Curated annotation (Swiss-Prot):
Keyword Oxidoreductase: yes
Subunit note: Homodimer.
Family per similarity comment: Belongs to the azoreductase type 1 family.
Species whose genome carries this gene: Halalkalibacterium halodurans (strain ATCC BAA-125 / DSM 18197 / FERM 7344 / JCM 9153 / C-125) (Bacillus halodurans)
The entry's keywords: Flavoprotein, FMN, NAD, Oxidoreductase
Gene: azoR1
Enzyme class: oxidoreductase
Co-factor binding details: Binds 1 FMN per subunit.
Protein name per its UniProtKB record: FMN-dependent NADH:quinone oxidoreductase 1
Catalysed reactions, as listed in the record: 2 a quinone + NADH + H(+) = 2 a 1,4-benzosemiquinone + NAD(+); N,N-dimethyl-1,4-phenylenediamine + anthranilate + 2 NAD(+) = 2-(4-dimethylaminophenyl)diazenylbenzoate + 2 NADH + 2 H(+)
Molecular function GO terms recorded: electron transfer activity; FMN binding; oxidoreductase activity, acting on NAD(P)H as acceptor; oxidoreductase activity, acting on NAD(P)H, quinone or similar compound as acceptor
HAMAP family: Azoreductase_type1 (MF_01216)
């Protein structure tokens, strides 16, 4: 079993980091035989999606040979795509920054949109090709958001991308309100960390 852990927060002592450590330490202890890969997106060279990358992605999908100048771009995207495809389970840890995800996570998700690899086109529309993958989303946000709050574009954003790939087995662990309610901050955080550990036990 291969499990990929994707972290998208470079702030020291962040609540996202605490969530990540609570989950992965519990998971590792209970799954010693798993192949575990940790990917810290802020430590990666990940150019934003642009016209060149879109063109290279199209050529690669069509099997068109790439010139040397485009091979490096293709390598960056394919390395992350193939790593994602190889994983049976994926854990994402990310904060809500300014109503959405960190730009580096947005870029990572852009890399995963690959026709014939993660989705395909049909007369009825897009069909995801990865229905058997299992995902956990670990999210920290200082305020409190209703489940259908349109201003929350972090967890919902990631879920929408995963749904395009056919992934629906998604578990979420959210710590929220620790900035909005500073008098209860520690209690809120500890409760969320305990939930992360419980989810990790059965993930």
């Amino acid at each position: 079993m291969e499990t990929l852990f994707v972290k998208a927060n470079d702030r020291e002592n962040s609540v996202t980091g605490l969530l990540y450590e609570a989950f992965i330490s519990t998971y590792k202890a209970l799954n010693p035989n798993d192949s575990i890969v940790e990917l810290d997106l802020f430590q990666e060279h990940m150019p934003y999606l642009n016209a060149l990358m879109i063109e290279v992605n199209y050529k690669a999908a069509q099997g068109i040979p790439l010139p040397t100048s485009e091979e490096e771009v293709d390598h960056i995207v394919k390395r992350h795509l193939n790593q994602f495809l190889a994983a049976d389970k994926i854990v994402f840890a990310f904060p809500l920054w300014n109503l959405t995800v960190p730009a580096v996570l947005h870029t990572y998700l852009d890399y995963l949109h690959h026709p014939r690899k993660t989705f395909t086109y049909t007369e009825e529309g897009l069909v995801g090709l990865l229905p058997n993958k299992k995902v956990a989303l670990l999210n920290a946000r200082g305020g409190v958001y209703a489940e259908d709050d349109r201003s929350e574009m972090a967890v919902s954003f990631v879920k929408n991308h995963l749904n395009v790939f056919g992934i629906t087995d998604i578990t979420t662990v959210i710590i929220e309100g620790h900035n909005q309610f500073p008098d209860r901050s520690e209690t809120i955080i500890q409760k969320g960390l305990q939930k992360a550990k419980q989810v990790a036990k059965t993930f």
